[in-house]
Amino acid sequence: MAEARLLRRRRLCLAVPFVWVVAVAVSRVGANTEGDALYSLRQSLKDANNVLQSWDPTLVNPCTWFHVTCNPDNSVIRVDLGNAQLSGALVPQLGQLKNLQYLELYSNNISGTIPNELGNLTNLVSLDLYLNNFTGFIPETLGQLYKLRFLRLNNNSLSGSIPKSLTNITTLQVLDLSNNNLSGEVPSTGSFSLFTPISFANNKDLCGPGTTKPCPGAPPFSPPPPFNPPTPTVSQGDSKTGAIAGGVAAAAALLFAVPAIGFAWWRRRKPEEHFFDVPAEEDPEVHLGQLKRFSLRELQVATDNFSNKNILGRGGFGKVYKGRLADGSLVAVKRLKEERTPGGELQFQTEVEMISMAVHRNLLRLRGFCMTPTERLLVYPYMANGSVASRLRERQPNDPPLEWQTRTRIALGSARGLSYLHDHCDPKIIHRDVKAANILLDEDFEAVVGDFGLAKLMDYKDTHVTTAVRGTIGHIAPEYLSTGKSSEKTDVFGYGIMLLELITGQRAFDLARLANDDDVMLLDWVKGLLKEKKVEMLVDPDLQSGFVEHEVESLIQVALLCTQGSPMDRPKMSEVVRMLEGDGLAERWEEWQKVEVVRQEAELAPRHNDWIVDSTYNLRAMELSGPR
């Protein structure tokens, strides 16, 4: 008996290490499979700029590679290779990235077909293959991506018909298949009923209701038949009276319906006039691309006549109201407050169109607008998690503080959104008021840049030279304040201040700091603490010990590079994105330190009472170490 028990114990002791090894192996299988899949992609692509140099197959998993983001379980959830000057072809192994949510390959020179295996990426939220050289058909399997919200395949050479399976994606919000060689009838059911001809433009062989061209053999486009309510049941004794009344009513309805249908048909033949000539109160269903023109009455009903109880916030451009549309969806309605001048309507509409064309997952999508002789309103999706500013400083007692990992995601996401405005919009869009209050948070706490384009929109009554400085004290770049001239580098400055808000949880301008003899400007306050080597005092107390020290230092370095006094010395937002992804920050910081060594002797004493212009003096080189 004793020998038998001893034998069982020995077997158990041998089995436990074996089980542990198997468990470790299993935990790495997913990461290794994903790493192999991404390395296959690297081998298939031509990388002229060595952006994939860090994709090393000898590493345990791909989570340390540049342009790859993983979740806490070390599974790949994001691949960002937009505008990387890549060529070559995609590989079917991409279908093994089971947890992938974002696949961004836009603005490259990738060719070949879109792999059917992408349909296996059932967690995908965004698929952006815009501006490449893809050929062949759109895979039918993409209809399996039931979480997809953002699909851009435009500006390629895709052919064949649009798969009807795509209509089953009920979550789809943004669709662009324009500028391809697609043919056949555009589906009009399911999610496709939301999309208008701009989503399918410049595909000469496409036809159907989603385009401006009817399909061969199909009747001309016509308005839907009028709704006929069911006839109520009447007793036999009233049948004759009902018949007579019904006949009179039918005749009257016909008398009024025929001219109305004819007028509607005539207007459908002239869609180019919809945007400019139709008053919103008379035709709320006018669209510009995917942009809806709402009636004022519709927005009054949605916001309970702009009730104060529905105010979400107030800003330099007006008040924002929470509203609920007739379909039940929640929206944020921005009621612009600028006075109206004659002749501004066309410019307003042009700027609204420009804003609507800026589509990126980190930009707040404009859903619609309303314009009357006395009102200008913009309609956006409602962001349930509010703004970064409200989450940092106005959260409810039951709301947890923003975790450090969430803050770093916000930093990167907002940088990507601003980079898109600067580098991918034509003409480029300068925000001019980048701050934590204008960075919104969606249901997944992803950063969404809001209020972009509004500064230009509100200057439509001015000349081409903008004379008004728009922005918020503490965020305004010194050159913008002194000259009134804005550029993308003024946005970079505001972004740097926003990073400091994320790190510290404090306001960019706060008179309350005077009570402790501190600087009212956040940038000056941060620099003062760094000079005193009190980096730990910078971190938001709400985080307690839940932050990564070297990541805090990296974010501070990026913030200081972004807030340099000279706009020429600040990085571009695209460079900021790369630095946040771990590419080039050490080199840029070292270069900055060398310059500071030269400047040290000439550095002036700090100013304590400069409340308007943020300090542009840089720190001594030794006051913040490089990455550890």
UniProtKB/Swiss-Prot annotation:
Q: Which spans are transmembrane here?
A: 243-263
Q: How is it modified after translation?
A: Autophosphorylated on serine and threonine residues.
Query: Could you tell me where this protein is found in the cell?
Result: Cell membrane
Active site, renumbered: 433
Tissue-level expression reads: Expressed in flag leaves. Expressed in roots, shoot apex, leaf blades, leaf sheaths, panicles and flowers. Expressed leaves, stems, sheaths and flowers.
Q: What is its EC number?
A: 2.7.11.1
- Residues with Phosphothreonine modification: 303, 350, 463, 466, 472, 616
Q: How does it assemble?
A: Interacts with BRI1. Interacts with XA21, XA26/XA3 and FLS2.
Miscellaneous note, as given in the UniProt record, is: Plants silencing SERK2 exhibit strong reduction of percentage of shoot regeneration from callus. Plants over-expressing SERK2 show enhanced resistance to the rice blast fungus Magnaporthe oryzae. Plants silencing SERK2 have compromised XA21- and XA3/XA26-mediated immunity to the bacterial leaf blight pathogen Xanthomonas oryzae pv. oryzae (Xoo). Plants silencing SERK2 display altered morphology and reduced sensitivity to the hormone brassinolide.
Name of the protein in question: LRR receptor kinase SERK2
Protein source organism:
Oryza sativa subsp. japonica (Rice)
